[in-house]
């Protein structure tokens, strides 16, 4: 609910009644009452429609900030639960492997008897539920990029509980991801967006979003029917592009269903609205398609490449779809837009460092020793000696070179 109004005594309040409001710019607005429900205990009540003060904007700002904070807490909680779930399930699977039981990768199902695996599954469910609820309170522009924190949390916990080494690139990537997420939270849009299924329906009918949906659908069909059978096994971008394009619809559906659940808690007959079932069907189709092609990408290409590329493509499509559908960027200051984009690209760099160099064994002490060696040679001459000291020369290789040159000389002498 964006703005609350208390009508004067005797003023009718029923569906279909039209209110005439006087705006601050001397214009008039006609508002039709589309739904009547029980009053909720909001702390601010508006009693004067003609007040010259900015009560409307103040209350809307307070409510929007409240929703933003709730969505932020839910999004971070989702990342914590999902990141922890990978560790719990992996820990349970490792315990089964130590016992000599058939592993899941070999077709075994003994993990169903392991309580740690079930704890991980419940943690995953709690994280997905929190993420689902976060879209009902906060903009998708904020919720979706924060999903990168689950990767960060999983990487940190794995180094402590699974004894998996986190190199210097991974640590820098974690720091960049946290900094980028913080910047995005600070500059996130705080508009009220859509607060009811009726408003959601109006947004979906907007010509701009209809054009966007048609273009995305056509591109997705071309990729699925024509490009994927030919180039899917050789080009990593094909499967990831399909997942990302379809993923934009899944997030929009989740956003709409979250609003429907909020209205259902307010005892509104949401189940009578066809849009509820349309969103539910769209979510099922889009998620099924995403899972199918994401599994193909993971099965065909290296995970260290799929994860960061998929994050960039998917988040970019969600932000674009949200900007068109919910107009989350409308009214944002230039500084906030730059800050949001900067935070997003910082997260991208962090995720890239975390995955692309995860097999690179470089420690902080090695970097410091290299820096000290470089500092010893002001003219850069010491570097050549360091290279010579670290180079491995084999006697056999040296002999091969001599033999090669001698054969060359012999051949040249015969020619002469």
Swiss-Prot record:
Annotated compartments: Golgi apparatus membrane
Positions glycosylated per UniProt: 25, 35, 50, 55
UniProt keyword list: Glycoprotein, Golgi apparatus, Ion transport, Magnesium, Membrane, Transmembrane, Transmembrane helix, Transport
Induction of its expression: Up-regulated by low magnesium ion levels.
Cellular component per GO, a single term: Golgi apparatus
InterPro entries to which the protein is assigned, alphabetical: Mg_trans_NIPA (IPR008521)
Transmembrane feature ranges: 68-88, 115-135, 137-157, 166-186, 208-228, 234-254, 274-294, 306-326, 337-357
Catalyzed reactions: Mg(2+)(in) = Mg(2+)(out)
Membrane topology qualifier: Multi-pass membrane protein
Chief location category: Golgi
Tissue specificity remark: Expressed in the pancreatic islets.
GO biological process, one term: magnesium ion transport
Extracellular-side positions: 1-67, 136, 187-207, 255-273, 327-336
Topological domain ranges for the Cytoplasmic compartment: 89-114, 158-165, 229-233, 295-305, 358-416
Gene Ontology MF, one: magnesium ion transmembrane transporter activity
Top-level taxon of origin: Eukaryota
General function of this protein: Acts as a Mg(2+) transporter. Can also transport other divalent cations such as Fe(2+), Sr(2+), Ba(2+), Mn(2+), Cu(2+) and Co(2+) but to a much less extent than Mg(2+). Shown to promote insulin content and secretion in Min6-K8 cells, particularly under conditions of hypomagnesemia.
Protein family according to the UniProt entry: Belongs to the NIPA family.
Entry protein name: Magnesium transporter NIPA3
Species of the source: Mus musculus (Mouse)
Gene that this polypeptide is encoded by: Nipal1
């Amino acid at each position: 609910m964006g703005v609350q109004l208390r009508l004067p005594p005797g003023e009718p309040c029923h569906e279909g009644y039209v209110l005439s409001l006087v705006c601050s710019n001397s214009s008039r607005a006609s508002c039709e009452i589309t739904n009547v429900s029980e009053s909720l205990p909001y702390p601010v009540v508006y009693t004067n429609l003609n007040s010259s003060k900015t009560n409307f904007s103040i209350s809307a700002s307070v409510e929007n900030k409240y929703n933003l904070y709730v969505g932020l807490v839910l999004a971070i909680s989702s990342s914590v639960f999902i990141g922890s779930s990978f560790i719990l399930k992996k820990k349970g699977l490792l315990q089964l492997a130590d016992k000599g039981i058939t592993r899941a990768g070999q077709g075994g199902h003994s993990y169903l008897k392991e309580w740690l695996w079930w704890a991980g599954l419940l943690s995953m469910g709690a994280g997905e539920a929190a993420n689902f609820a976060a879209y009902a309170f906060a903009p998708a522009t904020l919720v979706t990029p924060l999903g990168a924190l689950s990767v960060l949390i999983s990487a940190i916990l794995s180094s402590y509980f699974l004894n998996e080494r986190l190199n210097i690139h991974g640590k820098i990537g974690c720091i960049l991801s946290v900094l980028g997420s913080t910047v995005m939270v600070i500059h996130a849009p705080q508009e009220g967006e859509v607060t009811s299924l009726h408003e959601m329906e109006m947004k979906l009918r907007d010509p701009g979003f209809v054009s966007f949906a048609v273009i995305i659908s056509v591109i997705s069909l071309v990729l699925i029917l024509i490009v994927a059978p030919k180039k899917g096994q050789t080009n990593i971008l094909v499967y990831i592009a399909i997942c990302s394009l379809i993923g934009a619809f899944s997030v929009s559906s989740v956003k709409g269903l979250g609003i429907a659940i909020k209205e259902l808690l307010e005892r509104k007959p949401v189940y009578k609205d066809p849009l509820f079932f349309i969103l539910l069907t769209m979510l099922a189709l889009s998620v099924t398609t995403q899972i199918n092609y994401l599994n193909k990408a993971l099965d065909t290409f290296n995970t260290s490449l799929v994860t960061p590329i998929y994050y960039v493509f998917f988040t970019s499509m969600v932000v674009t779809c949200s900007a068109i559908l919910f107009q989350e960027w409308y009214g944002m200051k230039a500084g906030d837009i730059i800050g949001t984009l900067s935070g997003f690209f910082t997260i991208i760099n962090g995720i890239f460092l975390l995955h692309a160099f995860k097999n690179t064994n470089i420690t902080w002490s090695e970097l410091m020793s290299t820096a000290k060696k470089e500092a010893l040679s002001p003219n850069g001459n010491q570097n050549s000696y360091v290279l010579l000291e670290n180079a491995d020369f084999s006697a056999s290789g040296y002999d091969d070179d001599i033999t090669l040159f001698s054969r060359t000389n012999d051949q040249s002498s015969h020619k002469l």
